[in-house]
Regions:
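N-terminal secretory signal peptides that target proteins for export/translocation
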Residues: 1-7
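Bacterial N-terminal signal peptides
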Residues: 11-22
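Non-transmembrane domains of secretory- and envelope-associated proteins
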Residues: 26-108, 222, 233-269, 273, ...
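Solvent-exposed N-terminal domain segments of exported/luminal and surface proteins
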Residues: 30-213, 219
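Extended beta-strand-rich segments in extracellular/periplasmic secretory proteins, especially
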Residues: 85-88, 92, 153, 158-159, ...
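Short, surface-exposed coil-to-beta transition loops
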Residues: 197-198, 211-212, 320-324, 337, ...
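A short, surface-exposed beta-strand/turn
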Residues: 204-209, 323-338
């Protein structure tokens, strides 16, 4: 808010009187296609820039504005939403949904509903980004505030299989399991660095409100998979800035949090970035000279996006690194544009930052090397997420990724982004501790 004072001289009969009016006004954001927001003109964007992104712009990141492009729900997902959402019920505490089959559980959002925060988060949990399965190879770099590359991790896989809400591959809509599961995901095995070669993480998310995630980390030097305690899910792993609960912006159980809707608004976010697996998205390469520009994106598109701003506060942990999250959930596709994480003192600490290329196919000839058995018949747009990061804004440090690797040619990619493919790696057997260990050998 800015304060302007207006002074008006009185008439001749009241020459001695002066009326001083102080009128509060708010800066109105005025951003249009073709604008580039920088530190010099960032006031022009106003609250279209969230606090975490303002931190980046103040340190040199430009924001190139392109027109908003609506993201449509996938056809089968939209049909399932229309067919089944009317029967879905929310528990009184918001921790559980009943009668869910597929699609969005709560497509009609009423901001005056006292449970609106939980309903939005359940939509985020069953978002159309991940319906049956999804995966990609990835490379991650740890870069400090001087722009130095500290460490590199690479893997041929991050992959997730949904056990509920399935629409494309058999069995559907549910893969039977006791206890019932929502999804399983695997990170790894790593192929770099050498001291962690073969390491991987497996996470099982159960439907039961009080059933904690089953999470395991396989470390080759120990020759066994170690269970990750729920109490450690906010701890950074492998020396990176990210933690299990922060992956993709929010990766915790809905029932372990309380949520409230703070606002419905527009923000600037990268949803159609205009590139894919391209190292040139970054303002600079890690050279020890570029400072934080080495983990900032300069060459991507930003657009005004309608979002729900949700505050999440953890309630089920005896020890937890964060006091709260502020999450920016896209109204079109229910994915997380950004997630701001706050320390126990209430100060902004970290930012999770997704860069989407929401298209049916990211380039002509996609994919160069398809998965065995993959069809890639994508008529709908999907949430390709070729770049992103989690940045520590207090220590000026970042863990950024390219997925797939931007260091190699497409012919060298092993597994680039796929969605809803009926392949051997997307079966129940391929998401187990035994498979995690075997895949590392």
């Amino acid at each position: 808010m800015q304060l302007f004072c207006w002074t008006k001289a009185a008439s001749a009969l009241m020459a001695a009187a002066v009326i001083s009016l102080c009128i509060p006004t708010w800066t109105v954001a005025d951003v249009k296609e073709g604008d580039t927001i920088t530190k010099a003109n960032m006031d022009q964007a106003g609250d279209l820039l969230i606090p975490g992104i303002k931190w980046f712009v103040e340190r040199g990141m430009p924001v190139k504005v392109v027109p908003y492009k609506k993201v449509e729900l996938p056809k089968l997902f939209k049909e399932a939403t229309e067919k089944y959402s009317g029967q879905v019920k929310l528990s009184a505490d918001g921790h559980e949904i009943y009668n869910y089959v597929a699609g969005l559980p709560f497509p009609a959002i009423d901001p005056n509903d006292p449970m609106v925060g939980f309903k939005i988060m359940w939509n985020q949990e069953q978002k159309p980004q991940y319906v049956d399965n999804v995966g990609t190879e990835w490379i991650t770099e740890l870069v400090n505030g001087r722009g130095e590359l500290e460490r590199t991790y690479g893997s041929q896989f991050w992959r997730r299989m949904m056990w509920t809400g399935r629409l494309y591959t058999d069995p559907k809509p549910v893969v039977p399991h006791n206890p019932a599961m929502r999804y399983t995901e695997q990170f790894g095995p790593l192929f770099i660095p050498n001291d962690l070669k073969g390491a991987g993480v497996l996470n099982n998310r159960y439907l039961g409100v009080d059933v904690p995630d089953d999470s395991y980390m396989y470390l080759p030097e120990l020759r066994r998979a170690r269970r990750i305690s729920v109490a450690n899910r906010s701890d950074a792993f492998w020396g990176a800035d990210m933690d299990l609960d922060s992956l993709w912006g929010f990766n915790s159980k809905v029932s372990y949090w309380t949520f409230r809707l703070l606002a419905e608004k527009e923000i600037l976010a990268p949803v159609h970035i205009g590139t894919y697996a391209n190292r040139k998205v970054w303002c600079a390469q890690p050279d020890g000279k570029s400072g934080p520009l080495a983990f900032m994106p300069c060459n991507i598109n930003w657009e005004k996006r309608p979002v729900y701003v949700i505050e999440g506060v953890p309630t089920a942990y005896s020890q937890y690194a964060y006091s709260k999250r502020i999450m920016y959930i896209d109204k079109d596709f229910w994915g997380m544009n950004f997630s701001e994480v706050f320390d126990q003192g209430g100060e902004l600490w970290k930012l999770w930052f997704n860069m989407f290329e929401y298209v049916a196919k990211p380039y002509e000839g996609y994919p160069v090397k398809p998965l065995e058995g993959g069809k890639y018949n994508y008529e709908d747009a999907w949430a390709f997420t070729p770049h992103g990061m989690m940045a520590d804004l207090q220590t000026v440090h970042s863990t950024k990724w390219d997925a797939p690797s931007g260091y190699v040619q497409p012919t060298d990619w092993v597994n680039e982004w796929y969605f809803n493919e009926a392949t051997p790696i997307n079966t129940e057997r391929a998401y187990s501790v035994n498979f995690l260990i075997q895949s590392a050998r």
